[in-house]
Amino acid sequence: WGKRVFHCPYCHGYELGKEGIGVLATSELAMHHGLMLPDWGATTLFVNDAFEPTAEQLAQLKARGTHIEYGAAARLVSQTEVGVELVMQDGRVFPLVGLFVAPRIHLSPLAAQLGCELEESPMGCIVKTDAMQATSIPGVFACGDVARAAGSVTFAVADGAMAGLSTHRSLMFGC
């Protein structure tokens, strides 16, 4: 992700200080970031022509202190220590210490080719697993970003440990 564009407020929100945090909407999922990030600093939600907030959503954002900017983003200009500049199509420029995005997940076709059951998450399709990381296909286990919408190294390592344990048990005991 680099040093100034992020996907997870829990992983990176605290690193940015108190000023100039941006959320670039790619879908309505940006509301999640727009409501969460004010805990870490002054936040602007750039609607980016991706969705139109409802009156209720606008009230929620206002209550959290999130500023809203309309219009489409044109480009992101990288800077050094300071952060980035988000340049809008109409020429407005917003200096930011960091920018959050909520991209959709795109799975490899392998799980579907194996016949694994998939499920829709807020960020895209993931492989459905149980607590032991087993998929709907006996002997096939999934972990990390393929089986969890929240992209996190910590979760991936924990899920991987469980999938490894479960795979070994499956090979030994047929369960």
What is the meaning of each model-derived region?
Residues 38:
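Gly/Ala-rich phosphate-binding loop of Rossmann-like dinucleotide-binding domains
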Residues 31-33, 143-175:
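A conserved FAD-binding loop/helix module that cradles the flavin
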Residues 2-15, 104-150, 162:
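FAD-site-proximal beta/loop scaffold in flavoenzymes
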Residues 12-15, 35, 58, 91, ...:
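Short secondary-structure boundary/capping segments
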Residues 1-28, 32-34:
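Glycine-rich dinucleotide-binding loop and its adjacent helix/turn
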Residues 10, 26, 48-50, 145:
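Cofactor-binding loop segments of dinucleotide-utilizing enzymes, especially the Rossmann-like FAD-
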Residues 41-127, 172-175:
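A Rossmann-like FAD-binding core segment of flavoenzymes
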